[in-house]
Amino acid sequence: MGLTRSTLLATVAAGLVMTSAQAAELPYGLKEGKPYDGTKLNVLSVVTPQFDGLMLRDSEFTELTGIETEWTFIPFGSLQEKVTAEGIAANGQFDVINYLDSWGPPNAHWLESIDEWMEADGISMDRYPPAFAKSAQYEGETKGFPLRAHAQLMFYRKDLIPEPPATWDDVIRIGKELQDAGEDISPLALYFNNDGNRQNLFIWLNFLWAAGGEVFDADGYPAWTSEEALKASEDYIALHTQAKITNPASLSFVEQDARQSFMQGKSAMIPVWWWAYSSMINPEQSTLTADQVAFAGMPAYGEKAVTYAISMPFSVSSHSKNKEASWEFLKWLSNPDLEKRNATEREVEGKSIINNVVTHVANLQDPDINAANANIQDAAWGSLENSNIMPQIPEWPEVGDILSTAIAEAAAGGSTRELMTAAAEQATKVLKRAGRIE
């Protein structure tokens, strides 16, 4: 039986209504009509299960937009060199770039600012904790989204330590108690090695900021030689040189070594990023079980705790020939619904994914996400209430290296006060040479 004219018109009209409804329901502010259908984006990313989980779901993005993606995963230790090389080459090999926040300022000139895109699509950086949002910004411009970001927590052996330390004095007391009890374990794992990634500044910043000190003063000069800052630095180093509660290998430890020390049952406490929890209770990586590992907020130094936060934003390369399509990808990649699934679903496309990292304020407080991850997001949210990031200036890598060297030498027995003062003098020369200060 053939269609009458009225039936045909009704059918077409119904189809148009359905198409319009489907387009209106396109999520995350993605553009209607697949305007970038057939585009292929190249994504540079650090190696992590979190991003494995996103990559394994990117067929959802392709179905919505017609845009395909090709991911290149680089170990963290090699990523900075790769990012720097991409900026120098300026050939747009990668459309979307993942980097550590402190690498942002030296590379900001070739990372697209996304503020106009965000305004057009109704996206606000207020969806992130202030420290995370700040870490993806440079000189008033937003350079990307902090998709991987971390709060610091104190992890401890709850089978050996009944109550977590509330202060660094408590850390020392607990350490002495473990030593006096003859426990065959080092009380505390720290990482003083001058490794080139400035990891030995991570805990030092907690002491500095809690004491009321700053890295730079209001005029941009080194400020870590104020009396309160020097005292804080001395107290940080004294955990190793005077209290002697640290693992003896802390001088040579980088962060990964310290984590391994904890996971192998050789250290009883470690202040480290929250993401480490999943590996600490993973039998393929750790000798410990969930019954042995607990976590709490970072200890206070003096009357308060001020923590260091870090992030690894994703940005659009200014050299990309597919900037608009890359923005579509960032909108999808950063949406809170996807982030929630990635922190609660333990298998994607047949692959096991264990990830507890979320960066949206809503997800940090989400009861389902917390229930799936031993409430570690709630602890991280508490840590982030009073947190800050490393200075966002192009000269920071050089200045940070000077500081990192001073910390390592102080932990090895040098005079903390003299080394930090000399570091300030060196840093001042660097900043003057760069025109940052007069």
Go through each PLM region and give its residues.
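Conserved C-terminal helix/tail region of periplasmic/extracytoplasmic solute-binding proteins
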Residues: 26-28, 34-40, 68-69, 381-438
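Short, well-ordered beta-strand elements
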Residues: 37-48, 67-72, 95-96, 188, ...
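Extracytoplasmic/periplasmic solute-binding protein
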Residues: 141-147, 152, 172-231, 258, ...
